[in-house]
């Protein structure tokens, strides 16, 4: 059984991840990170992260846009509660969810969506495109990565106001799919990272990037998907990400045809 936006006593995946055990990111040090926000009662609220991949396209998790809402993207953001002077916002004009996504079964994979913005954002030192990996690229076990987001800073806690980052080394598929970790819930189309019981993603980080250092350059290898419903930072339950390198062709095709 899988839980979306809820809690269960069983150890099942729960979407909505956020950063636990992290530190405040240096201002605008992750310039492809976006805040996905929804409109409610005349105010905008952060719900998920995402990555700017073209000037008018954002990559996020499918489960972030399951519900019909008015969304906008804010980029160049650092502190959600104040105007940093570097932000740009754009309304979401079109949402393209992966055709195989099933909101009742996040463990099947395909937790990825692309958002076309109503206008192009301007690139500058605060706003940059995320670099995506090559199709099929698989990271070695214990590769150095960082998760970033404004998600909860502890299980059942509060959203972070300033962007957080946490070091989450990858856990390869052989280990992550073993019975003492996630078992068969994790698929080859996913990336696992963390699992030390201290640092993790948590609610509100979902859809955001896993930045991995490859040849000295940060590449977005993951889209934050789910954590254990027992808590965000559970030992041997790494944060699970959609593996971006499994979807490069799909991403390029969607952008080309829209």
Curated annotation (Swiss-Prot):
It comes from the Eukaryota. Disulfide bonds join 48-64, 145-212, 176-192, 202-232. The active site is at residues 63, 111, 206. Residues 9-18 form a propeptide. SMART domains: Tryp_SPc. It catalyses: Hydrolysis of proteins, including elastin. Preferential cleavage: Ala-|-Xaa. GO terms for cellular component: extracellular space. Keywords: Calcium, Disulfide bond, Glycoprotein, Hydrolase, Metal-binding, Protease, Secreted, Serine protease, Signal, Zymogen. Ca(2+) binds at residues 77, 79, 82, 87. GO terms for biological process: proteolysis. Belongs to the peptidase S1 family. Elastase subfamily. This is Chymotrypsin-like elastase family member 1. It comes from Canis lupus familiaris (Dog).
